[in-house]
Amino acid sequence: MFTLSYKINTSPQTSDSYSTYNDMHAATDWEDFLKRLYDLNNDGSQNTTEHTFQADYTTPIGKIHTLEAGAKYILRDNSSEDDRYERQIGTTGDYVLDEEHSSHYKHQNDILAAYMGYGLRVKKISGRLGVRYEHTKQEVKYLLGRGDDFNKNFDDVVPSASIGYKLTDMSNLRFGYNMRIYRPGIWYLNPYLNDSNPTNISQGNSHLDSEKSHSFNLSYSNFTQKFNINLSARYSFTNNSIEQVTEQVKDTEIEGLQNPTGKEVLYSTYQNIGKSRNASLSGYVNWNATSNTRIYANLYGNYTYMEGANGLKNDGWNLFAYGGAQQSLPHDWRISLNIYGQTPWIMLQGKGSSFFDYGLSVNKSFLNKRLTLSAFASNFFKKYTSPTSSIEGVGFTQDSWNRYTRQRFGVSVSYRIGELKASVKKAARTISNDDVKSGGGEGGGGGE
């Protein structure tokens, strides 16, 4: 089978924040620090656009062998425009663009990958070996603000292997190894110096390398008409993980900071300094209670040990739970209820926040199920959430509190064109780009 695929994806984000000062008082030795402050308006926009081209070929050889090969080309363009406006404290005039301390930045990744795989199936035993080569061309341009343009190239060989055993017609046991590459997203890379809080300054790092993670996984699955169960145990390690690093430094040491005074402030950025070890257990259960009722749950527990090249260490547990129910009603109505939550997540210098959310959706189908109208709402009894985080370093402890809304309300409309027939075969390979490390918004630059 030969498959050609194309996918386009774009993720625009905007931010607009204001920092103003009133009734400022300070000890005598901090008066110079107060004089450098301005009312600020940070107007930012970030965007990532991906074009992916993929070709896959799979062929059986005899009854027990399978060969596969393919290639993928990703054009990933990251862009960020952060404009800084300021005005004198205590005035009501217009904000004026500070072009010197604004930042317009482009980061382009061209990724070319090719893979080969071999599969074997003998009675109840199956196995697979694979290898993938990736070449990454990275180009960084500073269109406005401080920074030197540069280019970097990476070459990686990514192996994988797995073996499975068919316990029964409905259950399987599988063990596998794979290496994964996680490239930093725009929030990690954005070099904009965010000093809207002059005592807690943050900035991304455009010189970050990709993470390389190695993982071993043992899984058990069982599928019946009533129950679907999947259990897995996993161990992974990374020797160059991207971690947020917060230090207490004199503001004169921060390159590009406007009017430094020599006072000590907190400075956060990202570095490839981390060594992480993760052991996890997870389980998924789906119960078809009746022909119209489905109940499902997903549980995940993870123990993490982290160590930085600067001597920092941290470890701890993190738990995540997701569950819900779906009920089909007469006249093509369907209702779904979901709940999910997580305990505080572990960082190199502290821990993040826990959360608990819930959501409800209602769907109605028309025109022989061609047209579907949906309405959804999440956290409708809780308008605001107040996440916290804690960071510790040499000579300081930082506790952060935020408050924002997590309520979501929406509607959607979908219409199916054409007929769904059993003779229409689904592609064996589809495009999945999961190589970008998520997160990074808290400590990086780019507005708030």
Task: Report each predicted region and the residues it spans.
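Repeated loop/turn-to-beta-strand initiation elements of outer-membrane beta-barrel proteins
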Residues: M1-F2, I64-L67, K124-G127, M170-L173, ...
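Conserved C-terminal beta-signal and adjacent last beta-strands/turns
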Residues: N314-E448
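Surface-exposed extracellular loop regions of Gram-negative outer-membrane beta-barrel proteins
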Residues: Y18-T20, D39, E50, N109-D148, D169-H214, Y235-G262, S378-V394, ...
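Transmembrane beta-strands of outer-membrane beta-barrel pores
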Residues: I8-T14, T59, Y73-D77, V122-K124, ...
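Residues on the lipid-exposed face of transmembrane beta-strands in outer-membrane beta-barrel proteins
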Residues: F53-T59, A114-L120, A161-Y165, L218-N222, ...
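Outer membrane beta-barrel strand-and-loop segments of large Gram-negative receptors
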Residues: N41, E50-Q54, V96-S102, N205, ...
